[in-house]
């Protein structure tokens, strides 16, 4: 019997287009002998629109946008058990949901919470891990509690900054110095990130970052290599080989990731056995610190002095075939289609485990 897999993508997020690219790649890779593929598009206005079941790959993202041709529906009908005896609801129901959403409302625990309430199995991290992994400040606090070495940072609220800009800038200069990186606390794909070398650039960077979030984080500039590992699993996570990001630009921004191709991905990264083992151990600890499940990509700095610093974990990493996470697993012996199937299996495993939990006493 085939698995009815709901692909949820798009969303009210600055990473809407990234999500569309991910959905396109996944639809091309899925085996229609194993899965009934049901596309569910969230428009930029936040409307849920369901398209027809996909029986063959689509060629471009426009074919996955159903504002004009799809059927608006309530996500509540994803669970057939909530609508016993209703034929339409049963037809709409899904066995497993794969949220292919990046950024706020998709990667931050929001949709995960909805799916938990509906008791629908879903791929990837749960509410806690997703929200902690989205908020860079909370994430860094958890890493510190877990004893993971990381770069120095400070964080600011927009209200604090608007009332005392000069004091904020002085704190950055006093505690971190230049260069430093300014980032929205709750956004990915390098959206809204700036590298600063002066007070003037710092002011511009704060202005930009606060357009995307009410909270930002400023990190010290680290001189060294950027290394990433993929983590896969639930309670017994395993790691992929390591990969290195070698941007041809000053840093790995949104354009370098998704538009220009001005970045070399070196897989496997050239590391000593001790360096890899340190990163592997830290990646697992970071995964466990946020209570991860399914997948994360763990990002590290390897300084010129040989110090390993964890930068962040991404709970829904870029997932196109040319993204780092799938490429890491391909080099580790897991092809793209198999990776998707493993993630679906992990989602079902976790859901079945949760069903054994008692809710009465």
Curated annotation (Swiss-Prot):
Enzyme class: ligase
InterPro entries: ATP-grasp, ATP_grasp_subdomain_1, D-Ala_lig_Van_CS, D_ala_D_ala, Dala_Dala_lig_C, Dala_Dala_lig_N, PreATP-grasp_dom_sf
Cofactor note: Binds 2 magnesium or manganese ions per subunit.
Cofactor requirements of the protein: Mg(2+); Mn(2+)
EC number of the protein: 6.3.2.4
Residues that coordinate or bind ATP: 173-228
Catalysed reactions, semicolon-separated: 2 D-alanine + ATP = D-alanyl-D-alanine + ADP + phosphate + H(+)
UniProt keyword list: ATP-binding, Cell shape, Cell wall biogenesis/degradation, Cytoplasm, Ligase, Magnesium, Manganese, Metal-binding, Nucleotide-binding, Peptidoglycan synthesis
Residues binding Mg(2+) 1: 299, 312
Record keyword Transport present: no
One annotated GO biological process: regulation of cell shape
GO molecular function terms listed in the Swiss-Prot or TrEMBL record: ATP binding; D-alanine-D-alanine ligase activity; metal ion binding
Domain ATP-grasp: 140-345
Binding site for Mg(2+) 2: 312, 314
Cellular localization per UniProt: Cytoplasm
Pathway: Cell wall biogenesis; peptidoglycan biosynthesis
Cellular component GO terms held in the UniProt record: cytosol
Gene3D superfamilies from the UniProt entry: 3.40.50.20, ATP-grasp fold, A domain, ATP-grasp fold, B domain
Transmembrane segments: none
Family statement drawn from the similarity comment of this UniProt entry: Belongs to the D-alanine--D-alanine ligase family.
Function: Cell wall formation.
Protein name from the UniProt record: D-alanine--D-alanine ligase
Source organism: Bacillus licheniformis (strain ATCC 14580 / DSM 13 / JCM 2505 / CCUG 7422 / NBRC 12200 / NCIMB 9375 / NCTC 10341 / NRRL NRS-1264 / Gibson 46)
Gene that this polypeptide is encoded by: ddl
């Amino acid at each position: 019997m085939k698995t009815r897999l709901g692909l949820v993508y798009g969303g009210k997020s600055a990473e809407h287009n990234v999500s569309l690219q991910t959905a396109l790649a996944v639809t091309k890779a899925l085996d229609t002998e194993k899965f009934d593929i049901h596309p569910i598009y969230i428009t930029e206005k936040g409307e849920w629109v369901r398209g027809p079941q996909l029986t063959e790959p689509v060629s471009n993202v426009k074919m996955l946008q159903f504002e004009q041709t799809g059927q608006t529906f309530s996500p509540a009908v994803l669970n057939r058990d909530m609508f016993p005896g209703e034929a339409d609801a049963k037809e709409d129901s899904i066995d497993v949901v794969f949220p292919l959403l990046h950024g706020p409302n998709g990667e931050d625990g929001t949709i995960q919470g909805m799916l938990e309430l509906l008791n629908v199995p879903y791929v990837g991290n749960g509410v806690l891990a997703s929200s902690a992994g989205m908020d860079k400040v909370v994430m860094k606090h958890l890493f510190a509690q877990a004893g993971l070495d990381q770069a120095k940072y400070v964080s600011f609220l927009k209200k604090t900054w608007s009332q005392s800009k000069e004091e904020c800038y002085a704190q950055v200069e006093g505690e971190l110095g230049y260069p430093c990186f300014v980032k929205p606390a709750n956004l990915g794909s390098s959206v809204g990130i700036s590298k600063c070398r002066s007070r003037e650039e710092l002011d511009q960077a704060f202005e930009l970052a606060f357009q995307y979030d009410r909270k930002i984080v400023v990190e010290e500039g680290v001189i060294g290599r950027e290394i990433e590992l993929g983590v896969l699993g639930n309670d017994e996570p395993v790691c992929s080989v390591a990969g290195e990001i070698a941007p041809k630009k000053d840093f790995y921004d949104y354009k370098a990731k998704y538009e220009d191709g001005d970045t070399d991905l070196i897989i496997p990264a050239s590391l000593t056995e001790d360096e890899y083992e340190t990163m592997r151990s830290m990646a697992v600890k970071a995964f466990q610190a946020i209570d991860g499940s399914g997948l994360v990509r763990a990002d590290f700095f390897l300084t010129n002095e040989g110090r390993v610093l964890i930068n962040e974990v991404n709970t829904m990493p870029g997932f196109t075939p040319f993204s780092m996470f799938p490429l890491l697993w391909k080099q580790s012996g897991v092809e793209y289609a198999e990776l998707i199937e493993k993630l679906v299996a992990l989602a079902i495993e976790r859901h079945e485990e949760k069903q054994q939990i008692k809710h009465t006493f």
